[in-house]
Design a protein with these regions (language model features):
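Short, solvent-exposed loop/turn elements at domain surfaces
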Residues: 40-44, 165-166, 481
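Beta-sheet entry/capping signal
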Residues: 31, 141-142, 153-155, 461, ...
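Hydrophobic/aromatic-rich, well-ordered segments within soluble, folded domains that form packed cores
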Residues: 22-42, 170-192, 561, 571-573
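Short, surface-exposed beta-strand/loop micro-motifs that present aromatic residues
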Residues: 22-24, 141-146, 460-464
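Arg/Lys-rich, intrinsically disordered low-complexity tails that mediate electrostatic binding
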Residues: 1-20
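Intrinsically disordered, low-complexity linker/terminal regions across diverse proteins
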Residues: 60, 206, 212, 235-244, ...
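Noncatalytic, helix-rich "gating/capping" subdomain that lines the substrate-entry/channel surface
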Residues: 66-367, 404, 430-431
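Active-site-surrounding "flap" and adjacent substrate/cofactor-binding loops of secreted or lumenal enzymes
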Residues: 18, 27-30, 35-102
Length: 664
């Protein structure tokens, strides 16, 4: 990266100071989010090892430190096979072993050349299967997902892969020429690190292939369209439609299926067809060899000190604005948590179980679901039949809160204390065997905590899984600042209450509404209700895009629609929960308004976020969530109670002059 001159640094500093002064003059009615958080913004900075700072990241740092203690103070002192695996995996990552990693790279390079010598269609499928079994990404990905149409079962899914950038514009937009030029130089130097400066690999060939592959990748909006990403095909149909012999490919994994009846999900048929034709024609050429070897180096970059530094400098520093690498022990922890997930999860719960908070959140979830059902019943735009099915879906929604009693078995591998890359390859092979073993079986029952469905118990996050109709609130988030048992209901509703309601609403957002109470994908809506919902969605899209334009921000209202529906509806639900709570305690009028003011202030506080400009640009282009200032302001703008309490007028920044209907 080029260094900024002192003149440019001073110019940027002056610009930041000018922005801060402007923000400090704001009032509640102008920009509620910045008014509430301006002091916090002025006193906080982003860590050099991150590109964001907010309540989520601060708490996750705390949890990660606890996980380190779980490892060092407890697991490492045990004599069990699982404890030995954890220690060996951790030690292997803690210190780079470049010699062993380079040896593995050279072996894999020879393997690639051996497959290329086959020069036939069978050779391609054997090579793609070999790459998958060893954890090397290729242009066609294969993974196991929940079957949207057959509740409680797994299905294979074919998708896109093998690209460093997920936006096709990156490869074609003239404005991205400097980035592509830098990426080309990065690839050249990556090859040189392992193979020396006079190697035979060509960075321009890698770029050409990635550019060609990117022509048929989906946009972010298309990736969110289930009509495009949810196509079930037999192996015979895949071969006919996509020119890809899936049956031949899958049998190389030892998976037995009926080519004329077993269905696989194809996420982007045109991409698979385009890529398959391209590979069948050219995959053994020297041009494609550069691409394959670069994907190998991408795979190996986490295990080689020089590659690791260089990949950080491009992807983390240049593209994401992260100034400094995290300590190696953090990567070692992540590696152990990924491979020995059940052991880490059990021990984390043993020593950091938030049991009282789990009881509180379970009770609060039930209250929120009751209020949501009342709102569905009162809805003015839903017909009775759709209301009935919506209510049934709420009743059927399961909630995984905190932790569960059972976890899946750990990998039965011989992990080394010195060879991280071999450890990872062993794990990938075990994981592939796990997929093969469970493909034709039902999912484990809901007494198991499944990280494939429910994330990790140590994630500071929350989820909704539409294919099993389940909300997930991991143990890690069941603590301050999200759950505070010694604080009032206004505080807890603004934090964990909002999160619960938000995840529940995901069952009814743009995507969630296409699944029934059993998690099966089919249309349970009347045409009238479906048409009305689309009109309401357009209203949300227009509001968010209009408000963001005031700040010269181009927010994609369609990309962020589902999250915006969840945000706006969740706030209105927790408002109702708080009102019921206060009425039960005979709190009305001005005294009640004080509690609602506290709700709104706490809500804005929970979402305060500092981020680098690089991260903001990436989120605006790729993320389904709106930037946090719009998550707060656009949501509050839609609240009738908020507008009344703060006396929002047409001259105010928190005013919006178009219809804002109640959705959920």
């Amino acid at each position: 990266m080029s260094k900024l001159t002192n003149k440019h640094k001073q110019k940027n500093k002056n610009k930041r100071n000018k922005t801060r002064k402007k923000l400090h003059r704001l009032k509640e009615v102008d920009n509620f989010y910045y008014f509430v958080n301006k002091d916090w913004f002025s006193k906080n900075v982003i860590s050099k090892t991150s590109n964001v700072k907010n309540a989520f990241s601060i708490l996750q740092d705390k949890v990660d430190k606890e996980l380190h203690l779980v490892l060092t103070n407890h697991i490492f002192k045990e004599k069990s096979p699982e404890a030995k695996h954890c220690k060996n995996i951790y030690d292997s990552v803690l210190t780079f072993n470049n010699e062993l990693t380079e040896k593995q790279i050279y072996l894999f390079t020879e393997e690639i050349n051996n497959y290329r010598k086959m020069e036939c269609e069978d050779g391609l499928y054997k090579f793609l299967a070999w790459a998958k079994l060893n954890g090397i990404s290729s242009p066609i990905s294969l993974h196991m997902i929940n079957d949207n149409e057959h509740h409680g079962r797994y299905i294979l899914s074919l998708g896109e892969g093998g690209l460093s950038f997920s936006l096709k514009e990156t490869y074609t937009d003239p404005k991205k020429k400097r980035l592509i030029k830098a990426y080309t130089q990065f690839i050249k130097e990556t090859f040189a690190i392992i193979f020396g400066p006079n190697n035979t690999y060509c960075a321009e060939d890698v770029i050409d292939i990635e550019r060609e592959l990117s022509k048929k990748i989906y946009t972010q909006e298309e990736n969110g369209d289930l009509n495009k990403t949810n196509m079930k095909c037999t192996s015979s149909q895949i071969k006919h439609r996509c020119d890809f012999d899936f049956y031949k490919f899958i049998t190389l994994f030892g998976i037995k299926i009926n080519k004329n009846s077993y269905k696989t999900n194809v996420e982007n048929p045109e991409y698979i067809k385009h890529t398959s034709k391209l590979m069948l024609k050219e995959w053994t050429t020297n041009k494609w060899n550069s691409f394959w070897v670069f994907r190998l180096l991408v795979f190996a970059s986490g295990f080689h000190s020089e590659l690791n530094k260089y990949f950080f400098s491009f992807f983390s520093l240049r593209l994401n604005g992260i100034l400094q690498m995290r300590p190696r022990c953090d990567y070692a922890l992540s590696f152990v948590a990924n491979i020995m997930n059940s052991t880490i999860s059990r021990k984390y719960i043993q020593y950091y179980k938030n049991a009282k908070q789990k009881v509180f959140v379970t009770e609060l979830t039930n209250k929120i679901k009751c209020v949501f059902k009342e709102r569905i019943t009162r809805s003015k735009w839903l017909t009775d039949k759709t209301k009935e099915l919506a209510l049934r879906k709420v009743d059927s929604m399961s909630c995984a809160i905190g932790y569960r009693d059972k976890y899946i078995a750990e990998p039965s591998c011989d992990f080394s204390a010195t060879d991280a890359i071999s450890n990872f390859i062993q794990f990938v092979k075990w994981d592939n065997e796990y997929v093969i073993k469970h493909l034709h079986k039902k999912m484990p029952d809901k007494t198991y905590w499944l990280r494939t469905n429910e994330g990790n118990v140590f994630d500071v996050n929350a989820y909704y899984n539409r294919s099993i109709n389940e909300m997930i609130i991991p143990n890690a988030i069941l603590q301050e600042p999200y759950v505070c048992l010694d604080k009032n209901m206004a505080y807890n509703l603004a934090s964990i209450g909002f999160i619960i309601a938000h995840e529940i609403i995901h069952g009814f957002d743009k995507l969630g509404c296409q699944f029934d109470g059993d998690g099966e994908m089919h249309n349970w809506w009347s045409k009238e209700d479906s048409d009305n919902y689309k009109k309401l969605q357009e209203e949300i899209i227009e509001q968010y895009e209009t408000v963001s334009k005031r700040d010269n921000i181009k927010l994609n209202g369609d990309l962020t629609l589902s999250e915006n529906i969840a945000d706006t509806s969740a706030l209105q639900i927790v408002e109702d929960v708080l009102e019921d709570y206060l009425v039960e305690r005979d709190i009305f009028g001005a005294e009640q308004d004080k509690h609602f003011k506290e709700l709104y202030y706490n809500y804005a506080t929970q979402w305060r976020t500092l981020m680098t400009i690089s991260r903001m640009k990436i989120l605006t282009a790729l993320d389904g969530h709106s930037l946090t200032n719009y998550r707060v302001n656009c949501t509050l703008i839609r609240s009738e109670r908020f507008r009344r309490i703060f006396n929002i007028e047409p001259k105010d920044g928190m005013y919006y002059n178009k219809p804002m209907s109640v959705i959920w």
